[in-house]
From Swiss-Prot:
It comes from the Bacteria. This is dITP/XTP pyrophosphatase. One of its GO terms (molecular function) is XTP diphosphatase activity. Belongs to the HAM1 NTPase family. Pyrophosphatase that catalyzes the hydrolysis of nucleoside triphosphates to their monophosphate derivatives, with a high preference for the non-canonical purine nucleotides XTP (xanthosine triphosphate), dITP (deoxyinosine triphosphate) and ITP. Seems to function as a house-cleaning enzyme that removes non-canonical purine nucleotides from the nucleotide pool, thus preventing their incorporation into DNA/RNA and avoiding chromosomal lesions. Substrate binds at residues 8-13, 70, 154-157, 177, 182-183. Pfam families: Ham1p_like. The lineage of its organism: Bacteria, Pseudomonadati, Pseudomonadota, Gammaproteobacteria, Lysobacterales.
Amino acid sequence: MKHLVLASGNAGKLEELRAMLAGLPLRIVAQGELGVDDVPETGLTFVENALIKARHASAVTGLPALADDSGLIVDALDGAPGLYSARYAGSPTNALANNAKLLDAMRGVPAERRSARFYAVIVLLRHPEDPQPLIAEGSWEGTITTEPRGDGGFGYNPVFLDPVYGLTAAEMDSALKNRLSHRAVALATLQHKLHALSL
């Protein structure tokens, strides 16, 4: 079985990615298990940040690396929190504070203007200098609630409502969420390529 390092220190992302990749003939290893620290995300786009993370993890471990960079894009806030979703309310990352700041910023915004989407970019590098990284993107359309709902998931899940199911991401069971999410869409785009790679 081939090894693949997941370049993330976010426990919620790691759990989701591991579940989504479970059917592949790969041994998935979190970067923390290999002593790889998080690297500063200094890119100006989701793609740049994902490449930075994957390149760092691959360089330190010598293994192929998969990295995700994602965020919540809210139309009424001109795309915020966007690239800075994890640090929207400041550092260190605090999901409760981020959600509170978002709901405060959205106070008084009518229902028809509360559209948002989760967006993810997933990058696969076969080695640190890989000149042709595999890049896939995915999005999940929804709206922002007026108050948090649900106990599942992480991050902005309690305030992101899927209009088709009428549930927030935090109210969904993991099987449903892992089928609909922005990461699931991006991974589905990438998955068939993983089978053909010499990892």
